[in-house]
């Protein structure tokens, strides 16, 4: 029997992973997708627990065990505890799940490796910074030239005054 999809969200990614950059530590941020539909799944640690429970021999075929079997509740009441992304508990859960940049790249099959992407980003940033530095230097040179012209005009005018006396 096919379950009806009336109360379910449309197909799509349940979680979105974003690599950290700048002054943040290396790792992966967990962002929830499709917030507008009001569906919130289990947290990172609960997801691992459900995967482990699915592998146990008690689970039938490829079916996912229910919340009580996996020790996971899919109720929205547990969502406020899962939302705190900066809590140290979230880092521990990510470490337990074995999520880092390398296996995140392998799992989600990014088009280019993350270290290559960071190299490209650094090169682009250097190029943009250099163009700004070059603009500042060219402005300074232009100001210097105009100042020299002004000084030269003052010298010429002072020489004319001295010669006229």
Swiss-Prot record:
Polar residues bias: start-end ranges = 66-76
Spans annotated as Disordered: 51-102
Q: Which domain of life is it from?
A: Eukaryota
Pfam families referenced in this protein's UniProt entry, alphabetically: DUF4680 (PF15730)
What's the name of the protein?
A: Uncharacterized protein C5orf47 homolog
Which species is this record about? Mus musculus (Mouse)
Show the taxonomic lineage.
Eukaryota, Metazoa, Chordata, Craniata, Vertebrata
């Amino acid at each position: 029997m096919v379950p009806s999809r009336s109360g379910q969200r449309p197909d799509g990614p349940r979680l979105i992973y974003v690599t950290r950059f700048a002054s943040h530590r290396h790792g992966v941020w967990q962002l929830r997708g499709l917030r507008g539909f009001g569906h919130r799944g289990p947290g990172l640690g609960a997801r691992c627990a459900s995967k482990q429970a699915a592998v146990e021999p008690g689970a039938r075929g490829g079916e996912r065990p229910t919340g009580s079997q996996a020790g996971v509740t899919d109720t929205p009441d547990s969502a406020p505890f899962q939302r705190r992304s900066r809590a140290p508990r979230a880092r521990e859960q990510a470490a337990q799940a074995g999520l880092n940049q390398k296996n995140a790249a392998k799992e989600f099959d990014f088009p280019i490796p993350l270290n290559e992407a960071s190299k490209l980003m650094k090169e682009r940033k250097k190029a943009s910074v250099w163009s700004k530095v070059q603009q500042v230097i060219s402005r300074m040179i232009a100001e210097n030239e105009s100042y020299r012209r002004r000084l030269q005009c003052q010298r010429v005018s002072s020489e004319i005054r001295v010669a006229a006396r």
